[in-house]
Amino acid sequence: MTLEEFSAGEQKTERMDKVGDALEEVLSKALSQRTITVGVYEAAKLLNVDPDNVVLCLLAADEDDDRDVALQIHFTLIQAFCCENDINILRVSNPGRLAELLLLETDASPAASEGAEQPPDLHCVLVTNPHSSQWKDPALSQLICFCRESRYMDQWVPVINLPER
């Protein structure tokens, strides 16, 4: 490995960490503004009704989910729809960390403590535009820029690893 290759790899890792941090910030704000949709079927419904309002789509799966044929078909359809409608899309490689981020907020709600139901489907997460000027967010801009640059390099669905805390 040459010095240039080592330096390039180090820069890529640092950039991915920054993108992961930006994604955490976007999800945190989306949760607080209630502009988030969780679940494959719920996401498909929203994409069917109001695709112009969706600013980011996250797909999350681990190794076990890679063998779920039905889930992979849903992912393929959602990816195709997002690409056709210019919706930024990312794949999250550690759904456990995504669950920590999203369930932290929902566990605090009174509805979460009423019944111990099945855990929510976190395989697909949509972030929508809140129709406010507050959404001029540098973290979201960073994610959109990352998605655009990835598409230029023919990586239509870039994979993000959320940093562990």
Curated annotation (Swiss-Prot):
PANTHER family: GROWTH ARREST AND DNA DAMAGE-INDUCIBLE PROTEIN GADD45 (PTHR10411), GROWTH ARREST AND DNA DAMAGE-INDUCIBLE PROTEIN GADD45 ALPHA (PTHR10411:SF3). GO terms for biological process: DNA damage response; regulation of cell cycle. Its main location: nucleus. Keywords: Cell cycle, DNA damage, Growth arrest, Nucleus, Phosphoprotein. It is found in: Nucleus. Belongs to the GADD45 family. It comes from Felis catus. The modification Phosphothreonine is found at residue 2. This is Growth arrest and DNA damage-inducible protein GADD45 alpha. The keyword Phosphoprotein applies. Might affect PCNA interaction with some CDK (cell division protein kinase) complexes; stimulates DNA excision repair in vitro and inhibits entry of cells into S phase. In T-cells, functions as a regulator of p38 MAPKs by inhibiting p88 phosphorylation and activity. Signal peptide: none annotated. GO terms for cellular component: cytoplasm; nucleus. The gene is GADD45A. Interacts with AURKA, PCNA, GADD45GIP1 and MAPK14.
